[in-house]
Amino acid sequence: VSIGDRLALVLDPNDKKKATLVIDLEDLMGIWCYIVMPKLKDFANMSNKEQARKLAAMPDSVKQTYYIPREYGFWVKDNWMSQSVGYVREDAIVADASPVVYPPLGYFTAWHIWNGKFVIVSGTPYRNAKGEFMVKDLHNDTCDIAYLDEDSLVLSDGVTSRSYYKKNNINELNKKAQEIASRLSKQVLEENN
C-alpha cells in the first residue's frame, strides 16, 4: 500500500478502528487475463475416446493453425467500469470452417467491492431499433479475492478458483491468434475471388 492509494476496507464489527480486510484498489486496477484453449466442435456430443481419436487423426498443420491458446479476461477501470478483453475478430466463413470452438467470452461492464468481495457485472450486448449499443440481462458474479498483488490475482467463488496475470498493454493480447485469424481471412478471400 502506497500513499494516495484508494482502499476498500471491511471494518471489524467489534472495533471500528480496526479493519479485518484491506484491498488496495490500485493493485486491482488493470488488465487481468487467463488462458483458454479451444475444444473440438460438437465436443459435448463426443465421448473422450472419440475426441482423442479425432485429435489423433488431425494433421499437425491443422492443429498448429487452430489449437492456439487465447487470453481472456477483464479490464478493471476507474469509476467502477470494466471491459472484456480477449476478443479475436474472425471472418464468419473461417469460424464455420474451423474444427474447434472457443469458450464464449463474457461481456463485462462494471465492477465494485461489496463487503470485501469483488463483484463484476456482465450481460449480453445487442443493438436496439435505433442502432444504439445496449446491454441486457445484467448479472453480478461475486468472488472472494483469494490473492492479490501487483501482477497476480486469484478469485474464488467458494467452489473453484481462477488465477489471473496482469497485462500492461491491451494491444499485446492474443497477438498470435489475431495474426492467424487475419491470415485465414485473407486465404478465404483469395479462394472466393
Describe the predicted segments one by one.
Residues 22, 75-76, 164-165:
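Short beta-strand element of the conserved SAM-dependent methyltransferase core
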